[in-house]
Amino acid sequence: MRRTQFRPRAVSDTTARSRRAGRHTKQPADGTGSRKLRSRVLIAGAVIVVAVVAWVGVQLLRPVPPMTLAVSVTTMRVLPGPAPRPDWPGQAEAAVGLPGTGLLGTHGGSQPVPIASLAKIMTAYLVLSGHPLSAGASGPAITVTAADASAYASDQRQGQSVVRVTRGETLTERQALEAMLIPSGNNIASLLARWDAGTEGAFVAKMNARARSLGLRQTRYADASGADPATVSTAADQFRLTLLALQIPAFRQTVAMAQVTLPVAGLTYNVNAALGHDGITGVKTGSSSQAGGCLAFAAARTVAGSQVTIVGVMLGVRATATQPSELDGVISASENLLSSVGGDLEHVQVIRPGTVLGNVSSAWTAGSAAVAATGIAVTAWPGTPVTVTVTPRPLGRRAGPP
């Protein structure tokens, strides 16, 4: 059966209507009348297509309507088991905890006390913040000035902890940091302060400004080395600062070194006698008649196949009949504290895969369960409060091709 084509039929109908009306309109021989009609049909069709495409485009580009998440998972929980009982150091201030988890606890009050050479943690933190050292880099050269050589001689006469330097000697930034943090040269702290800020006073102003910006409200610096007893802080503040400093690879590597060879001073050793024992990887010792024994320490532990670092701070440990050296006393006290908490860490899964976290709803649906795609585990001590925060990513995106 033969199909009737649409286009010829349209022309025939027009001619038939003209005849019935008694007016026969002769079509031009060249077919222009047919072409005009076809053009009108095609234009109308094009308008419809354009309108449809435009409508679809608007729908595709329309923003996804807002969606809301109602959290139903318990947001606060306590890890099971009895909490550890830290062996705190008598009347001294102390703090211990983990990166990411925070403080396990503090002891001995929260009054600012002298911190001796723990001030050098902030000095190193500021220097490395302003003059970062990449892995293996030595950094810029620092020439020992006449003022630096004079400060060395003056500090030595006062019985301070010093590292020998001579006028005209050249130290790299890394060597200067090693000289300050490993044998704990007070004169090197002042040298670095002058190199960074022009004068030690200007550098101390930067130290105090940074302490305020970090929220170390009980911390005040009077010098770059901590020899001045007016340089004071708390164990909790120094714990927070130590966590930040340990995030800098150059700092972390330096405080873990047992010894270093310097251009003029030669081979020098780390003052921290506990370094390398029981997983201890740093951080900084300090002692003076006003400050007593002070120590910021870090110790590695392996829990469920993963390495974690216990961080602690002790301030104001005093000499005793059994520990006549304040420095030996604070190292011994830190070992006792570490032993009392180091074996109690646990790896606990607080959110399992598939856990219902809440309900997602929108204007066009009653809601769907939001579930955890993966689990969340923490390494902490039993009895530690854990806060679970559910933060949704943007629910949806602009429609259309990726």
Model segments located where?
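Terminal targeting segments of Actinobacterial cell-envelope proteins
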Residues: 1-41
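Active-site-adjacent loops and short helices of periplasmic peptidoglycan-processing enzymes
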Residues: 2, 59-236, 243-249
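Conserved SxxK-family serine transpeptidase/carboxypeptidase catalytic domain
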Residues: 5, 9, 57-64, 340-402
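Hydrophobic membrane-insertion alpha-helices, especially the h-region
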Residues: 42-57
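Penicillin-binding protein/beta-lactamase superfamily catalytic region
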Residues: 93-102, 222, 227-255, 297-299, ...
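N-terminal post-signal-peptidase region of extra-cytosolic proteins
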Residues: 104-114, 159-162, 281-285, 294-295, ...
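Short, mixed-charge aromatic SLiMs
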Residues: 146-157, 262-269, 360-367
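A penicillin-recognizing enzyme superfamily signal
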Residues: 252-345
